[in-house]
Each structure stands twice: as structure tokens, then as C-alpha cells.
């Protein structure tokens, strides 16, 4: 709801060209990162819910135009090799076995700064929490186009694959926090085509 108005506002905040992106491409990143209430209606929440669903093939067609614009923007940004951090307010150790490879089908928001995750609006410092320490090679720095520049957000693309290297508890004083170390790997087949082609490869399987 209200997406057209928010898209108009996003374009108004992207009046200068950066990173060779057009105004519309920059605005797509701005709109993707925008927050509003209720949170479950934010564009990035709804879109990622579709991308991560079992029946994404049936649900994704209405998103094709926006996805092509957003992916065109992200493919123009330089891919960065770095260690990034992602936080989830759950204990996910049982879902990630050491040595196994996992595919993330949604856009994955990460940060360069671990201190950002410690803020209350993200992971906080209480309750069950999992931090992912991710050695990635195609992180996209979107700060110049984000609606919240202070977060230093790094976006990982759909279809990214990771091997679980280890997990550990960083402090006995905080038994609810665990860190899972992931290393990004190249999948055996292309799972995400450049936006000049079909957005998703026909090889994408259903589910995880």
C-alpha cells in the first residue's frame, strides 16, 4: 500500500547520479531500504518473503519490473570482498551444520560494523541471538543510495551460497549469543542471471 507515493518520495531523494546509476535505479535501492509502519508491509519485508517462499515461481511475477530495476542498480555497483555481519534474534545453530552449503534466496542485509548490530533496533544485547560473520566476495555497498546511510549496509544478492566454517560462543558472560562463520562460495550453476537476461535462472529449485 502507498508504494506509488513512496516511490515518488524516493525519486525526490535521488536527484544526483552516483555510481553510474540512473535516478530510477538509485530510487529503487532507496525504496528497498525504506522503513514504515507496520513493518510487515515494508517493501523489503514483503519482497524477501516472496523470494524465500517455497512457491516463489508462482509469487514472483508481479515483482519482475521492480526486481529488474533493483538488480540493474546492484549489478552496476562494484562487488566487494570483505567480512560482513548479519544478525538474527534467534538461536540458529541447529539450522546450520558445519561443512554444509546453504543458499540464501532473499536479499540479505549486512553491515561492515558489528557495533551496528548491537543497537536495540537490530540485534540488541539481550535474548537469543545469532551473528553471522560472512566472508563474502560480492557484497554491494549501498550506503550512497540507502534511505538510512548511517547503517553502512552491505547487500548480498539472492542465490548467494555459503559454507559453514564454524560456530562459537564469544563470551561465557553472554550465553545467548552465538556467532556462525560463513564463507561465500561459487555455486556450480548460475542462480541469478544479470538483469539484461531473465532475472532468475531456470535452474533455480524450489524451497531452500
Please name every model-derived segment.
Residues 2-143:
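Internal glycine-rich, Lys/Arg-flanked active-site/core loops of soluble domains
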Residues 89, 101, 109-196:
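Active-site and NAD+-binding cores of ADP-ribose-processing enzymes
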Residues 198-207:
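Intrinsically disordered, low-complexity linker and terminal regions at domain boundaries
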Amino acid at each position: 500500500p502507498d508504494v506509488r507515493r513512496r516511490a515518488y518520495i524516493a525519486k525526490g531523494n535521488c536527484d544526483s547520479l552516483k555510481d553510474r546509476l540512473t535516478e530510477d535505479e538509485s530510487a529503487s535501492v532507496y525504496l528497498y531500504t525504506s522503513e514504515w509502519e507496520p513493518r510487515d508491509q515494508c517493501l523489503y519485508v514483503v519482497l524477501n518473503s516472496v523470494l524465500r517462499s517455497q512457491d516463489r515461481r508462482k509469487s514472483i511475477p508481479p515483482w519482475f519490473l521492480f526486481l529488474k530495476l533493483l538488480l540493474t542498480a546492484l549489478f552496476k555497483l562494484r562487488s566487494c570482498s570483505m567480512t560482513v555481519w548479519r544478525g538474527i534474534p534467534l538461536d540458529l545453530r541447529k539450522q546450520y551444520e558445519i561443512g554444509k552449503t546453504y543458499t540464501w534466496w532473499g536479499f540479505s542485509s549486512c553491515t561492515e560494523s558489528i557495533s551496528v548490530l548491537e543497537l536495540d533496533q537490530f540485534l540488541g544485547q539481550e535474548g537469543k541471538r545469532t551473528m553471522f560473520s560472512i566472508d563474502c566476495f560480492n557484497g554491494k555497498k549501498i550506503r550512497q543510495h540507502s534511505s538510512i546511510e548511517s547503517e553502512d549496509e552491505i547487500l548480498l544478492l539472492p542465490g548467494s551460497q555459503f559454507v559453514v566454517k564454524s560456530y562459537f560462543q564469544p563470551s561465557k558472560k553472554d550465553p545467548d549469543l552465538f556467532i556462525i562463520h560463513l564463507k561465500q562460495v561459487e555455486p556450480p550453476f548460475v542462480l541469478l542471471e544479470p538483469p539484461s537476461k531473465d532475472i532468475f535462472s531456470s535452474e533455480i529449485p524450489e524451497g531452500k
